[in-house]
Amino acid sequence: MKINIIGTSGSGKSTFGRRIAEALAIPYIEMDRLYWRSNWQGTPDDEFLATLEKALAASPDWVLDGNYNRTRDVKWRDVDLVVWIDRGFIRTLWQAVTRASRRAWHKQELWPGTGNRESFRRSFLSKDSIIIWTIKTWRSNRKRYEADMGFESQWNENVR
């Protein structure tokens, strides 16, 4: 089974995706791990798409966690199930703040070998703040996902 978990930053995609992959004993693929390089440098789109294609082709079954709208054609080409983690704004924001605080406090490296760690400054006070990103994108992501998961789409068995 090929599953893509989508949702706004802080909604719980990674936690849910890891649990599903573990329960099904299939590979878990985190798109952020494929995208982010050292010093928070993103991977160029052509390379990112090639890396994603390679990761998806490596196993007949997988759980993929991530949005990256520009990858939709690649990740949904053969997907069996799309799961949208549709949390309310307050809960999503709370989860994003809690996660960012925990990561900053523990100085946790997010993706091995990148050296990327969240800090209180980066998480709360910078233009690259994941908290600000969550606030800015929650509503637009929700509208996009509603359209993607709407009755007229191929994903018409919705459980919210």
Predicted regions and their residues:
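A glycine- and Lys/Arg-enriched "phosphate-lid" helix/loop adjacent to the NTP-binding pocket
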Residues: 87-141
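The conserved Walker
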Residues: 9
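Active-site signature of alpha/beta-hydrolase-fold catalytic machinery across serine-
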Residues: 19
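Conserved nucleotide-sensing/catalytic segment adjacent to the nucleotide-binding pocket
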Residues: 27-82, 87
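Hydrophobic anchor at the beta1->P-loop junction of P-loop NTPases
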Residues: 5
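NTP-dependent small-molecule kinase module
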Residues: 23, 129-160
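Conserved lysine of the Walker
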Residues: 13
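Hydrophobic positions on the alpha1 helix immediately C-terminal to the Walker A/P-loop
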Residues: 16
